C-alpha cells in the first residue's frame, strides 16, 4: 500500500505546480491511497481528478475553464503557510498581503484585482470559503490548516459566481470529516522563532452524525524591528479554530454540514520601510528593509474574524439535487497605519474596519446522460464601515495650527450592500466528443453610502479613544443610493476527441459593482453646472459615484495527457476587453490652491477602456519511474504565464481639459511574465516514503500602481523554495524540512507613494534631487517586502 500510494501523493504535489490537478488526483487522492497495487493507483491517476469550478463535481478534463487546484498534501509538501503562497506557481496570478497588514488580502488574476481594502470598493477576484463568498478582503489571508484543496479559477466567472469575479475566483475548501475517529497533531518550528501547532479531532457520533474541530496557534518573531517603539516588525501572533458537525443519512441522499470558524490576529502593526530620507527631519534610510521607525500606536492593533455556515445537499431523485448554502460572517480590524514610518506625526492613520454579511444561496442541480447543469438564486446583505484619521501634525503650522494641536482629518464611510441574483448554466453533450455549455446570470445590486469627512484638532478622534474635535463644518456629509443591474452570460464549446484530450472555446462576461468613494472630499468637487458657490448635491453625487466595471472575455484552451499520463499539459489563450475600468486613487488635497496639502481624499474614476490578452501553460512530466523500487519516480513540472495588459483609454481632467493618459499609465500588480519550474522525486526509504521537491519561480517587473514609480516598482526577481517530507507507518507519522526564499531575495510587494508627480506623465517632481511630498512634509514613500528566507521543520502524528 505504501509503495503504491507514493506515486499518487507526489502526482498530487506535481499538479499543484503544473496543471492544477490535471496530472494527479486531488479530490480523489485519498481513494488512490487506499489501493494496494500500483495498477490501481495508475487507474485512479488517469480519471479521478475532480474540481467544482462549475459548482458541480466534474473531472478537470471536462471543464472548459482555466483552473489550477492545490490538494492538501501538495500544500504540505511545498511548505505552504497561507493562501498567498500559491501565487508563485499559478500563472498570471498575484496574491499578497495588502500593505500594512498580516491578514488583509490583495489578489490579482490576469490583471484584475483590488489594491485598496477600503469598504465601498469591490474586489475583482472573488474569495470563497466553502462556497461562501467573502465580501471584504479583511481577514481573507487564510492560513493553511484543515484544508482539502484550493482552486484558482482564472478569467471572468460572472455567470456561476456573480459580481466581483471579473478577474477570477479563489476557492478555499475545508476538509470533510472522516467516517472513523481521527486525531492529528502538527507542530512546526523554524527561523525567526516560528512556532506553530495545529490539533485536529474528528469523532463519529453514531451512524449519521460526526463532529470535528481544529485549533491552530501560529506565531513567528519579526523579520525586523520597530527601532522607535522597541517591538518586532513583521511578526505573527494568531489563534484560530474551526468546528463542524455533519449529519448524513445512510443512503447518502441527505447531507447537512454546519461549521464555524474563528481567527484572532494579535500581531504587531506591520510598518513599512522608507525609501527616501525624511524631508523635514532628515531621518536616514535604514539598512534593514524590515526595520522601521514608525511611531503610531493608536488604536492597538487587533483583528478578529468569525462566521457560521450551513451547507445542505439533498438528493431529490436520480436526476435532481437541491443544495443550500447559508452563511453569516463578521470581522473587526483595528489598525494603526503610519504612512511616513517615522516617529514624527506626519501622515499617521489610525483606522478601523467593521464588516458583516449574511448570505443565502439555493441551487437545483440536474444530471442525466446528456444534459447536466443547475439553476440557482443568491442573496447577500452586507455592511462595511471604514473609519480613519489622517493626522497631519507637521502640516498644521503651515496653516496656522500649532504642531502639538495634532491637526488632521477624520473620515467615516458606511456602505450597505444588498444584492440578489438568479442564474443557470447547462451543458449538453451532442455526442461523446461534442458538448455545448450555456449560462446566464441576472444581478441586481443596491448600494447605500454615508460619508462624513471633517477637519479636526486634537487627534486621534474619539472613535479611536482620543479627544479630536471638529474644526469648522464637515467637509463632506453625504448620503447616496444607487442601483445597478447586469446580465452576465457564458457560452462554451468543447471538443473531446479522446478521453485524454479537451479542446474548448468560450465567451463570458463579468462585472465589478459600482458605488461611491467612501473617502470622498466634497470640497474638491468639480463645478459642472456653471453655478458659483459650494457644489450642489447633484455635483457631489456624480463626483463620488463610480459605475460598474464590465468585461467581455474570450478564451481558447487545450488540456490533455500522453503516454499513460506520464506527460500532461494545459494551454490557454485569452483576450479581454474592459470598459468603465474603476481606478481608485488616494491623493493629497490642496483645496484653496495655496500649495499646501492640508487634507486627504479618495478619488475613484471610471477611466475608460483596457485590453488584456495573454497565454498560459501548465506542464507535467514523469521523467523516471520505478527506478529505485516500486513507486519511485522523478517528475518535472512547469508553469508559464504571459499577459499584455494595457489601458486603451484613461480619461482625466488636466487643467480643465479631458486628457487621455493611457500612454502614461500601466496596469498594477500585473507582471508581464510569470513562470515556475519544480523538480520532484519520490523514493521508498526504509519503512516509509521520502518526497522531495525544489521550485524556482520568476516574476518580471511589477508596477504597483497605475502611475509608474521608479522608487517603488519591483524589478524582475526569482524565488527558490524546497521541501523534503518523510512518511511512515501508513502515513501515521510524517516529518518534513522546508525552505522558502532560500536565496533571501529582497522584493517589494506594495507601498505608499505620497509624492508629487507630473499630472500627465506621472514622473516624480523633484527638489534638489529628492521627491516632493504630496501629503505631509516628510515625504511618505514607504515599501513593504515579501518574506525573507525561512527554514522550518514540521512533524505530524495521526492517532
Put a short name on every predicted segment:
Residues 1-78, 83-90, 202, 256, ...:
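N-terminal Sec signal peptide and the immediately downstream disordered periplasmic leader
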Residues 44-180, 556:
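Acidic, small-polar-rich N-terminal luminal/periplasmic segments of exported/outer-membrane proteins
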Residues 118-121, 177-182, 205-209, 250-253, ...:
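Short loop/turn motifs that connect adjacent beta-strands in outer-membrane beta-barrel proteins
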Residues 122-124, 136, 145-154, 159-227, ...:
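Outer-membrane beta-barrel translocator/receptor signature
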Residues 178-180, 188, 200-297, 331-345, ...:
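Periplasmic-side early beta-strands and strand-to-turn transitions of outer-membrane beta-barrels
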Residues 311-315, 321-337, 496, 502-508, ...:
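Membrane-embedded beta-barrel scaffold of Gram-negative outer-membrane proteins
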Residues 372, 432, 436, 566-578, ...:
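Gram-negative outer-membrane beta-barrel transporters
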Residues 697-705, 726-799:
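C-terminal beta-signal and adjacent terminal beta-strands/loops
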Amino acid at each position: 500500500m505504501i509503495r503504491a500510494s507514493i506515486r499518487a501523493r507526489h502526482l498530487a504535489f506535481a499538479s499543484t505546480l503544473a496543471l492544477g490537478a490535471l496530472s494527479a488526483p486531488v479530490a480523489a487522492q485519498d481513494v488512490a491511497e487506499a489501493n494496494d497495487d500500483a495498477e490501481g493507483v495508475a487507474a485512479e491517476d488517469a480519471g479521478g481528478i475532480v474540481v467544482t469550478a462549475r459548482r458541480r463535481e466534474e473531472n478537470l478534463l471536462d471543464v472548459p475553464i482555466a483552473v489550477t487546484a492545490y490538494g492538501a498534501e501538495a500544500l504540505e509538501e511545498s511548505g505552504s503557510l497561507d493562501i498567498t503562497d500559491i501565487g508563485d506557481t499559478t500563472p498570471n496570478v498575484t496574491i499578497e498581503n495588502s500593505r500594512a497588514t498580516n491578514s488583509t488580502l490583495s489578489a490579482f488574476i490576469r490583471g484584475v484585482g483590488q489594491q485598496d481594502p477600503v469598504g465601498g470598493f469591490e474586489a475583482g477576484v472573488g474569495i470563497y470559503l466553502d462556497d461562501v463568498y467573502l465580501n471584504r478582503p479583511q481577514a481573507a489571508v487564510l492560513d493553511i490548516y484543515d484544508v482539502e484543496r484550493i482552486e484558482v479559477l482564472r478569467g471572468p466567472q460572472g455567470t456561476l459566481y456573480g459580481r466581483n469575479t471579473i478577474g477570477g475566483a479563489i476557492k478555499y475548501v475545508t476538509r470533510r470529516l472522516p467516517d472513523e475517529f481521527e486525531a492529528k497533531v502538527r507542530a512546526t518550528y523554524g527561523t525567526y522563532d516560528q512556532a506553530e501547532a495545529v490539533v485536529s479531532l474528528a469523532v463519529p457520533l453514531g451512524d449519521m452524525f460526526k463532529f470535528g474541530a481544529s485549533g491552530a496557534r501560529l506565531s513567528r518573531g519579526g523579520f525586523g524591528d520597530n527601532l522607535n517603539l522597541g517591538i518586532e516588525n513583521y511578526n505573527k501572533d494568531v489563534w484560530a479554530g474551526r468546528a463542524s458537525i455533519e449529519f448524513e443519512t445512510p443512503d447518502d441522499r441527505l447531507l447537512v454540514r454546519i461549521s464555524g470558524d474563528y481567527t484572532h490576529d494579535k500581531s504587531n502593526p506591520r510598518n513599512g520601510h522608507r525609501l527616501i530620507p525624511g524631508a523635514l527631519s532628515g531621518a536616514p534610510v535604514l539598512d534593514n528593509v524590515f526595520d522601521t521607525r514608525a511611531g503610531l500606536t493608536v488604536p492597538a492593533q487587533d483583528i478578529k474574524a468569525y462566521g457560521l455556515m450551513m451547507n445542505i445537499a439533498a438528493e431529490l431523485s436520480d436526476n435532481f439535487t437541491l443544495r443550500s448554502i447559508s452563511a453569516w460572517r463578521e470581522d473587526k480590524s483595528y489598525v494603526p497605519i503610519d504612512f511616513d514610518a517615522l516617529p514624527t506625526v506626519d501622515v499617521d492613520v489610525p483606522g478601523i474596519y467593521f464588516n458583516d454579511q449574511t448570505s443565502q444561496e439555493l441551487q437545483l442541480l440536474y444530471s442525466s446522460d446528456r444534459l447536466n447543469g443547475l439553476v440557482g438564486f443568491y442573496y447577500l446583505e452586507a455592511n462595511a464601515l471604514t473609519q480613519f484619521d489622517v493626522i497631519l501634525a507637521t502640516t498644521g503650522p503651515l496653516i496656522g495650527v500649532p504642531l502639538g494641536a495634532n491637526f488632521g482629518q477624520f473620515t467615516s464611510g458606511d456602505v450597505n450592500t444588498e444584492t440578489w441574483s438568479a442564474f443557470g448554466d447547462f451543458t449538453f453533450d451532442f455526442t461523446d466528443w461534442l458538448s455545448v455549455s450555456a449560462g446566464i446570470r441576472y444581478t441586481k445590486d443596491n448600494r447605500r453610502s454615508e460619508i462624513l469627512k471633517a477637519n479636526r484638532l486634537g487627534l486621534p478622534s474619539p472613535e479611536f479613544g482620543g479627544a479630536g474635535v471638529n474644526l469648522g463644518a464637515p467637509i463632506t456629509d453625504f448620503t447616496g443610493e444607487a442601483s445597478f443591474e447586469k446580465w452576465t452570460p457564458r457560452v462554451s464549446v468543447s471538443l473531446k476527441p479522446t478521453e485524454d484530450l479537451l479542446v474548448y472555446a468560450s465567451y463570458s462576461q463579468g462585472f465589478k459593482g459600482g458605488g461611491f468613494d467612501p473617502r470622498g472630499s466634497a470640497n474638491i468637487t468639480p463645478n459642472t453646472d456653471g453655478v458659483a458657490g459650494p457644489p450642489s448635491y447633484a455635483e457631489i453625487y456624480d463626483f463620488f459615484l463610480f459605475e460598474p466595471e464590465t468585461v467581455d472575455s474570450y478564451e481558447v484552451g487545450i488540456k490533455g495527457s500522453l503516454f499513460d499520463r506520464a506527460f500532461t499539459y494545459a494551454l490557454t489563450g485569452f483576450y479581454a476587453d474592459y470598459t468603465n475600468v474603476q481606478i481608485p486613487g488616494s491623493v493629497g488635497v490642496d483645496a484653496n490652491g495655496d500649495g499646501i496639502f492640508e487634507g486627504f481624499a479618495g478619488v475613484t474614476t471610471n477611466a475608460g477602456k483596457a485590453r488584456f490578452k495573454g497565454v498560459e501553460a501548465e506542464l507535467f512530466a514523469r521523467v523516471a519511474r520505478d527506478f529505485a523500487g516500486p513507486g519511485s519516480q522523478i517528475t518535472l513540472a512547469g508553469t508559464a504565464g504571459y499577459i499584455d495588459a494595457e489601458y486603451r483609454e484613461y480619461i482625466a481632467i488636466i487643467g480643465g481639459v479631458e486628457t487621455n493618459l493611457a500612454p502614461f499609465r500601466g496596469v498594477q500588480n500585473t507582471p508581464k511574465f510569470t513562470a515556475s519550474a519544480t523538480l520532484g522525486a519520490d523514493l521508498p526509504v526504509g519503512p516509509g516514503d521520502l518526497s522531495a521537491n525544489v521550485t524556482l519561480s520568476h516574476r518580471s517587473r511589477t508596477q504597483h500602481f497605475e502611475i509608474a514609480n521608479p522608487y517603488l516598482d519591483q524589478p524582475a526577481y526569482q524565488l527558490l523554495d524546497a521541501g523534503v517530507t518523510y512518511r511512515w507507518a501508513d502515513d501515521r507519522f510524517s516529518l518534513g524540512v522546508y525552505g522558502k526564499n532560500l536565496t533571501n531575495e529582497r522584493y517589494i510587494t506594495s507601498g505608499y507613494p505620497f509624492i508629487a508627480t507630473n499630472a500627465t506623465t506621472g514622473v516624480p517632481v523633484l527638489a534638489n534631487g529628492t521627491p516632493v511630498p504630496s501629503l505631509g512634509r516628510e515625504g511618505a514613500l514607504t515599501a513593504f517586502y515579501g518574506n525573507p528566507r525561512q527554514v522550518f521543520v514540521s512533524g505530524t502524528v495521526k492517532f
